[in-house]
Amino acid sequence: MSRKKRRKSKPPPPSAAAEPAPVSSRWRFFVWMSAFFFLAALLTRLDVMTAWPGSEGFALANALGNDWGRYLPSALNHALLPLGLSIDTATDAIFLFPRLVSTLCLLLTAFFTYRWAGRLFGRRVAELGLLCAAASLFLPFFGKVATADALALLGHAGMFWSVLLYTVGRDRKKLLPFGIFALLGAVAAPVSTLLLALMLVILVVFQREDYPWLTPAIVSVGIACLVLLVQGPQGANTYWYYGQEDSRVLDLLFYGLLGTLPLAGWVVAGIRDLVFKGKQLEQFSLIIGMALVVTLLAQSLLFMLLIAIVAGKQMQLYFREANYPWRDWVKSCSVLHLVLAFAVAFLALAGGALAFPGAGFRAALGMAAAYWIFSLLATLGIFGERRDFAIGGSILAGLLTVLFFWVQVYPYVEAERAWPRRLLARESMIPSTLQLPDEADESELSSALPYFSLAGWKLGETGNYRLRLSPVTADSTQAGEVRGRVILRQHVFDLVPVE
């Protein structure tokens, strides 16, 4: 036999099963409709939102200050701020274009996930995974705020898919894209990116002969270390919600799983499936399972995207495999979620009736009703083996809840979140120096920092004045105090001299 005939064929990508028959027009319509709802939720209120507490408040204040050149995303925001200011000076349109950068990064993440994860795991799994990500209650939020989280997600997702195509898929052309995405991730969140790169170093040690991990490991570690040397860890001002130096692993785990409540049955069954098949050394489960652990420890938003991929995989298996073993898990969790959703919606509406009486309550009622009704349709579809009800109900429960929140409910929240402008208007004092709030204990006050910078105040570790937050204890506020909400809870805010 000739040497050419004895040559081994290239191994197929992991779990790249044969694609199903061509999709129906109903499925195409559902996908495009879901994409429209997702995009509408991303773009709504971008130009009228008060800066969010925490990372966005610090990031926008840094872009408006004198230290914007020390951090590349802040430099980009600094260059984009005048574009929004030229549109409208009376609203928050000045922050529109920095927020649109996050929106663009989130959309690019979806694009590369569809293209590259589809090659690895099948186009249908990629589609379902992205639909589950869009239905998440928290992941789309990072496309609406002017922080580096969405940029870090783009970099980390691009790194993950491209390195799998380079090593497992034997596509040598993906090394250059891998380096580009590693640079994007390192610029946004250098410490988190370095931790992800160290995962490749571990693979070099334990799988040096199976796949070519060495070159990507050298490239990613080198880029992350270079950015750390030039830019620094950027851990002092919390320019991103996740990926900072102090640990928020439990926060990421909690909100990552809480955001998948519309997909509860699929997520629980998916995790059970990962554990079972991981013990059998099934490649998809090993890759995704290891990536979930590493991205959680690295505090990367890629963790949320991978959870969505796991849920999407179960949606495919549930209706494709006749002997799908976790059918009872999906059904039980779906029923439990439906009961809990009704109880939570009732309590939320009761609280909403007190916080936002009248029209605000009716808006919240519409949002809660959409969530519960589509969750009910999903549960009926799961028990009745109706694929359109099961998948469509689960996806639309999350998508429409997020969309209704921004369109119907958020205007009532925003009316009280705009306390920084009211505080500046009430004080009417000559701009001075403002002491930065403590990130750990007073991050709620960071919403006001960009507005004080716009008013001519100087921000620093020390200052003549500081912001103060206190609970509401009386029906009226004293002179110089304003009432408002950080997000939901009502507080009293004022400006006091530093003692």
Task: Give the ranges of each region predicted by the language model.
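Specific aromatic-rich, kink-prone transmembrane helix
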Residues: L151-G169, I307-V310
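Aromatic/acidic, Gly/Pro-rich catalytic loop(s) in extracytoplasmic/lumenal soluble domains
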Residues: L436-A440, A455-L459, G463-E499
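Transmembrane-helix motifs of polytopic, lipid-linked glycan transferases
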Residues: L96, L100-L120, G158
